[in-house]
Curated annotation (Swiss-Prot):
Catalytic activity from the UniProt record: dUMP + (6R)-5,10-methylene-5,6,7,8-tetrahydrofolate = 7,8-dihydrofolate + dTMP
Entry binding sites for (6R)-5,10-methylene-5,6,7,8-tetrahydrofolate: D223, A317
GO annotation, biological process: dTMP biosynthetic process; dTTP biosynthetic process; methylation
Gene: thyA
Organism superkingdom: Bacteria
Lineage of origin: Bacteria, Bacillati, Bacillota, Bacilli, Lactobacillales
CC annotations in GO: cytosol
Protein known as: Thymidylate synthase
Residue positions binding dUMP: R25, R180, R181, R220, S221, G222, D223, N231, H261, I262, Y263
Amino acid sequence: MAILEQPYLDLINKIMIEGHDKNDRTGTGTRSYFGAQMRFDLSKGFPILTTKKVPFGLIKSELLWFLRGDTNIRFLLEHKNHIWDEWAFKNWVNSDEYTGPDMTDFGLRSQSDPEFNKIYQAELKKFDRRILDDENFAKKYGNLGDVYGAQWRHWQKRDGSFIDQIENVIEQIKNNPDSRRMIVTAWNPEDVPTSALPPCHVMFQFYVVDGKISVQLYQRSGDMFLGVPFNIASYALLLNMIARETGLQVGEFIHTLGDAHIYSNHFSQVKEMLSRKPYESPQLWLNPEKKHIEDFDMQDIKLVDYKHHGTIKAPVAV
């Protein structure tokens, strides 16, 4: 057993001490560090944080959503996952059809104005309910555009046909494991202007040696307190699922970040997290009857012995 989150704790502490204070797209402000790397040996356990509770169910449903090639939040809402709500809601309130209360800068205003936050939460709840109840509304306003699911599984070529990058990379791993081209990318410059949020985890590459498979992720932008813990667990889970399908043992997850940042309104939460003593990392259980990534459902993926400290809440910068 091991404490696999230590590289994350070391990096977030380094950013607090050595990072540069910068402005950002959301208007919140960040403390930022450029060019960082963390390594996690997945043969020793599963690298989910224990210094705060990380909701593994949300990570599972989001990854399954990506792997389905889905880009509509309806699937997520059906699994009580609200990670992407704000991005779809932003499209709705900026549309000509929206006639409700003014939602300009709802992300920042909801943090500083309690009365507005009540109005915002009520509108967001109505929006989610309508996505679930109204299929046509969901098709129009629940779709986030060319986000991860589309790029991973339906990359559009110039001739109008599509590339399934996940299927292709699995075939490469099986048939040519020494290839240096086992890459999946989500960054398409043509789609950046129309995407709800241009991909943060831009590309990942697989590497096979001695019967073990590793993956390295390049992430252009990482919200260290809220987003990155999800990304670590998500790619660790993805690697385990790919290892299952290809008959390999898991090796390392290597996480390389461009702009690794802590939002200024997360500083106190980070300090609280760093004051806690981490527990040993849990183990991942995958249903042994499932051999292919498309076969996995929520109940086929579990954590064993996940002991953790309490939740630390923090606002999302949109």
